[in-house]
């Protein structure tokens, strides 16, 4: 649905060194360097409140988004996968910086009514997300190195010492996570989520972090924010395969998958897990189903400020 509010519409294609800018009125293309001083000068030239569409590009869009928001403009961060499909849907035959900037402006003009403007996340969200991502990179590197050195015995003792140093760094990251949570007054929320079978400290931290990013009205919106809502492709009598949208932070989904692998062995969820396996579902499908259930339970606990009641317990 086209935007109803009369605002100037701008599409910006972001690269590391350059911003290619399309102004819908007066149908003008321009470019500036992707540096704060240049961005500030350009923002001052805009005619009043403006709606700006930007494709998320690594971290290169962050300065533009934050400065535009501070200047009073509405900023819309567009998912790259969604924009790519939109290009195909409207018959786009080329992909250049200029065409992407035009496409972003067109997308915002036609679909803006259904989009939500970007708002800055709470400070604690950025800190927790940064620490969780750094830890994920650390563990990924450790796993890769351990596998590649598995058959090399000549430096086994030295490598073992190296792995222990990685483990110590991991513990320091987790300690820092607890400090951030304590300063933000969120340790109680983490403990509330940890009461759920399979959910440990890291998964609980990720769930609390995600919950504090937005004002979620329902479990469905929370699941969608985690990128665990389903993409449906049905037509006539044919029911297509379901896929996760996988939007948002991939580390939260990875931690939830690990939590589901642990929960499926617990008394509370073993029956659920085996039932769906016996119905013919694949292991990954069942683990995704269980991950979604765990996330929904965590959301309900945080939303209602209630305590977890294990399956079979009497709820007062």
Regions found by a protein language model. Give the residues of each.
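Long, charge-rich intrinsically disordered scaffolds of nucleic-acid metabolism proteins
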Residues: 2, 12, 69, 76-195, ...
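Two-metal-ion RNase H-like nuclease active-site motif
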Residues: 6-14
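Mobile genetic element proteins and their domesticated derivatives, centered on retroelements
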Residues: 13, 21, 52, 79, ...
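Nucleic-acid-processing active sites and adjacent nucleic-acid-binding tracks
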Residues: 24-54
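Acidic, metal-coordinating catalytic cores used for nucleic-acid/nucleotide bond scission
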Residues: 53-64
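Short, solvent-exposed helix-loop connector elements
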Residues: 116-129, 151, 240-244, 271-288
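Phosphate-backbone recognition surface of nucleic-acid-processing proteins
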Residues: 201, 206-283, 315
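Low-complexity, acidic/Ser/Thr- and charged residue-rich accessory regions of DNA metabolism proteins
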Residues: 237-238, 272-316
